[in-house]
């Protein structure tokens, strides 16, 4: 699947997989990305239905909240499974 060709998108899904949701700035800091770069990758993930973003007011400030969808969870889990299966065939 083409969406997994980007290391950044794989990292985003990996971080979100273990969380109920997170704020935009949390992802930006964890992945050391610019606003524009993160927005670009989130847009691609949203177009595939792998993540959802919404604006929420938290402590009087508007925050962008990101969460992985069920479709995104299944796709990421399958991607990791495929990687693990491939790694079993590697001889050192």
UniProtKB/Swiss-Prot annotation:
Organism whose genome encodes this protein: Methanocaldococcus jannaschii (strain ATCC 43067 / DSM 2661 / JAL-1 / JCM 10045 / NBRC 100440) (Methanococcus jannaschii)
PANTHER family: BSL7504 PROTEIN (PTHR37318:SF1)
Residue spans crossing the bilayer: none
Name by which UniProt lists this protein: Uncharacterized protein MJ0432
Top-rank lineage group of the source organism: Archaea
SUPFAM superfamilies: Winged helix' DNA-binding domain (SSF46785)
Record-linked Pfam families: HTH_34
């Amino acid at each position: 699947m083409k969406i997994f060709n980007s290391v950044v998108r794989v990292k985003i899904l990996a971080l979100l997989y273990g969380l109920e949701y997170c704020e935009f700035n949390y992802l930006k800091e964890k992945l050391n990305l610019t606003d524009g770069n993160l927005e670009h990758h989130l847009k691609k993930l949203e177009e595939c239905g792998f993540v959802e973003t919404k604006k929420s007011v938290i402590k009087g400030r508007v925050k962008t909240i990101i969460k992985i969808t069920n479709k995104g969870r299944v796709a990421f889990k399958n991607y990791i499974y495929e990687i693990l299966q491939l790694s079993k065939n590697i001889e050192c």
